[in-house]
Regions:
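Catalytic machinery of carbohydrate-active enzymes
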Residues: 1-306
């Protein structure tokens, strides 16, 4: 028999979904597990080894019915015995409706499905929601992400023994999710005096912030545009600390076991989606413009020793 799991995005959610896929795999030993996801996450999920096959969903506009129907026919023809909807979006509810007459057992939030988990009426962390969803079919608590499959050689970066990660970026279209670069720099300088070298992480879109931090904290090491997902996980395993905005790389770093402080504004709700673990601290202000360097430093978790 074959099992379909659906998880489209985004990076942080994909990291949080890894324990779910691991639990589904254990619950269905010997069955063929297929993941329906989007192109940016195919490589990550292949490397995880948690699924046997990956389908890419282009997520066409729902009015482009021809493309949507091709996917629906593919799902029907595969003869899945069960579908785990780990996305829980309007799109995946629509997929369920389009499968009328030939539906596999569906575990999700689509009204009328075999194992229905209602959408929460109050803020609930996605991990808890999915834990309850899987419990409907007898799957035990999936636990936390394990990124042991993400390994890389970070010796090429020439980092000192004691370093910390600064992740000042975020979605370009949501600038309110970013703590000001000058405060990242000020915090970096404070921690530099305590023996931790700041290492700057980001993409091309964050080049401006990282350049500003580097100017104000010249001893920081600039790795902008140089790190893969595997690099981030490996850097996180060896870093003493990490501090960053609510962005995908912080999910990877925190999931690697790095003591982490994640910063939130009114733009996102850490009660719904945030890294998990005893080594993770969350700090929120209505506006990150109002978060002082002193308050951020006070909120840091204990640094990893050695």
């Amino acid at each position: 028999m074959a099992i379909l799991a659906i998880k489209h995005s985004a990076l942080g959610d994909m990291i949080l979904s890894l324990p779910l896929l691991r639990a589904i795999r254990r619950h269905h030993p010997g069955e063929h597990i297929v993941l329906l996801t989007t192109a940016p996450y195919v490589d990550l999920m292949h490397r995880s080894g948690l699924v046997d096959e990956i389908w890419t969903d282009t997520r066409p506009k729902l009015w482009r019915i021809g493309e949507t129907w091709r996917l629906i026919r593919r799902i029907r023809d595969a003869g899945f015995s069960r579908v785990y909807d780990l996305q829980g979006s309007q799109r995946t509810k629509w997929y369920y409706r389009l499968l009328a007459g030939a539906r596999p057992e569906w575990v999700g939030n689509a009204p009328g499905c075999a194992y229905h988990i209602p959408d929460p009426t109050e803020p609930m962390h996605i991990t808890e929601l999915r834990r309850r969803q899987l419990a409907l079919v007898g799957i035990p608590d999936p636990g936390l992400p394990d990124l042991g499959f993400l390994q890389s050689d970070i010796a090429r970066f020439g980092l000192p023994p004691r370093y910390m990660l600064l992740v000042p970026g975020g979605a370009p279209h949501r600038p309110a999710k970013r703590w000001p670069a000058e405060r990242f720099a000020a915090l970096g300088n404070r921690l530099l005096h305590k023996g931790l070298t700041p290492v700057l992480i980001g993409r091309a879109a964050e080049r401006g912030e990282i350049g500003a931090i580097k100017s104000a904290c010249p001893e920081a090491i600039d790795l902008c545009e140089q790190t893969s997902i595997a690099d981030l996980a490996t850097l996180g395993r060896h870093a003493a600390l990490a501090i960053g905005n609510d962005t995908g790389p912080m999910h990877i770093i925190a999931a690697s076991g790095c003591p982490s402080l994640v910063l939130y504004s009114h733009e996102s709700d850490p009660r719904k989606v945030s890294p998990r673990g005893d080594w993770v601290r969350l700090l929120q202000r209505p506006s990150l413009q109002d978060l002082s360097v002193e308050d951020a430093e006070a909120a840091l978790p204990p640094a990893r020793q050695g």
